[in-house]
Amino acid sequence: MRVGIIGAGSIGLLFAAYLSRVFDVTVYTRSQEQSAEINQHNVLLQSGTEETIAKVKALPIADWQGSEALTIIAVKQYQLFSIIERLSQLPSMPENILFLQNGMGHLKLLDGINTNNLFVGSVEHGALKENPYTVRHNGIGTTNVAVYKGDPGFLKMFVSSVSNVFPITYQEEYFAMMEKKLIANAMINPLTAILQVNNGALIDNPFYYKVLQNLFSEITAILNLEHPEEYWEHVIKICKKTRDNRSSMLKDIEAKRLTEVDAILGYLLEEANKQGKKFPQLETLYYLIKGIESQGVVI
């Protein structure tokens, strides 16, 4: 089966490296230079002390025709607008599309896509792009996937096909799955980005831990969570499991890139606004990240 991956950042390269063990994978890059590098070197996957080379074809995004059986969209949420516009210009709409963005702000964009099967996923792996063709897998987790619209048959087949090489878990209900990841993103990403610390510091430092608790109280109120303890335990588990990792938002800030704060905290603040309520700690974090972004972001 042919799989196309749109985006060659850390997650795009990680998926390309593992899925190439089962499928014929083409990764579509933003620049001609990166696709040339991948075609010359293939994708180098680093995991622990091991290095493996994955045979992957690369093309610039301008050459994307959407002809693969599965298309995986692995770009940042704020880059989706141009990708969705490109979708409408393809000779034929891809039949199966999997979106792998953080937050939930992008879900409203999916309703305008006219295709048979739309899937969404939440990635719990830690990955770092070392150079245009090298990715380090520094936190092994899973990828949860669910049907946003369409038939689950194809997605279940895909999950079973890769289960021996890359952990992907099928979930029955997309909203609960995305909400769980949103909560973790909203608590871990902004704090680590502002404090410039690894994930584990949020639970190791008692003062940071208190801020984490306060944030969770606000998020619980916005989302009206029925069993908040389950979500809290999930966040703590992630902090423990990825204690030495730097969050994606922190890495974006360090690289002077735009973050996905609008898809994460922006989404929560929109929900709060619908309720006519103010949540000052979340709002403060949102404006702090936007302020950092405004200081000379390079996209």
Language model regions located:
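Short, well-ordered alpha-helices that flank and scaffold nucleotide-derived cofactor binding pockets
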Residues: 17-21, 85-89, 108-112, 266, ...
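NAD(P)-dependent Rossmann-like dehydrogenase/reductase catalytic/cofactor-binding core
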Residues: 213-299
